[in-house]
Amino acid sequence: MKHYKCSLVLGKFCPLHKGHMLLIQRALEASDMVEVVVDNIMDEVIPVRRRMQWVKQQFPTAIVTTQEHPLPQDPSETTFFWDIWRDTLLRILPHPVDAVFASEPYGERLAKELSAEFVMVDLDRKSVPISATSIRKDMIGQWQYLSPVVQQDMRKVICVYGPESTGKSTLTRQLAQHYHMPYVEEFAKKVINEKNGDICYEDMETIVVGHHEAIVEALRQNTPLLFVDTDAITSKLWSNELFGKESPIIEEYIAKQRFDIYLLLDIDLPWVNDIHRYRPNERDVFFHQCEEQLVVRGRNYAIIRGKGKQRLSNAIEYVDRLISHSFNASGSARLESEK
């Protein structure tokens, strides 16, 4: 392949996917430097600064920039379409370009306007059969085509949380089955079973560390969703409830566990006794303690009520909303909590 001094790649990267990665990588391999212009578009689904950050993280050697204001997207919008784009690019590009890499036919005309050579990459989408439009319509179904940095940014981790005997473990499994995604079981149950229900203060640290390690291990699967049964806040509350104190490391692990949403389960289910449960008459107090912890820490949460299929349906509604808000500015949905 011919080598170029400075090449241009222009795109929306909404979101950045493996087709875009192929395009930029080809430009990098054939150029001393590559300038990537992330198109600042009207009514953007994903803010331009977030899209720029994805490209910068995925390709740290590329020069990434954008235009200050949105520009026409089709020549039919104005007779000055190519003049506007040429003048804008010449103004914002730090270096003159001698090649334009693109996967769309427009690249040929753009290259001509910039007095550069045009390099077409995978026009027929044979190497990477995907489009950003199809990804936006079905992020989970097209997950494998997203760039690694976008996958990390878009992934949602949901914690099922609350007092005893509210169906946390059951709901966690049901959600995982519904979305065909992995889940993390409550590590405390393993410890309690091993101790035949007779746990001590020192076990709380084991529970917190073990549960967090299980979450980290599950995240390595790199799936779009992960469901987690309880968290370190739960261990904090139970440590104080059972032993009147807590290990200093618990707060450390609470800070590490930033879930996209907590599904706080209400106490509207009957008590079912088993070896893992201790306070049948204090669920109401514990529920309010659970909620208070989320409020003071600024955690995103929704209260889940209902029995049987209705409970699952209510939880699915919030998870679906979380998924639909995946492309907002922060990278993490902030739903209105039902309080």
Model-derived features with residue positions:
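Conserved Walker
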Residues: T170
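Conserved substrate/cofactor phosphate-moiety recognition/catalytic segment
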Residues: R173-E217, A315
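Conserved nucleotide-sensing/catalytic segment adjacent to the nucleotide-binding pocket
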Residues: D198-K245
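Conserved glycine(s) of the Walker
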Residues: G167
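P-loop (Walker A) phosphate-binding loop of NTP-binding proteins
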Residues: P163
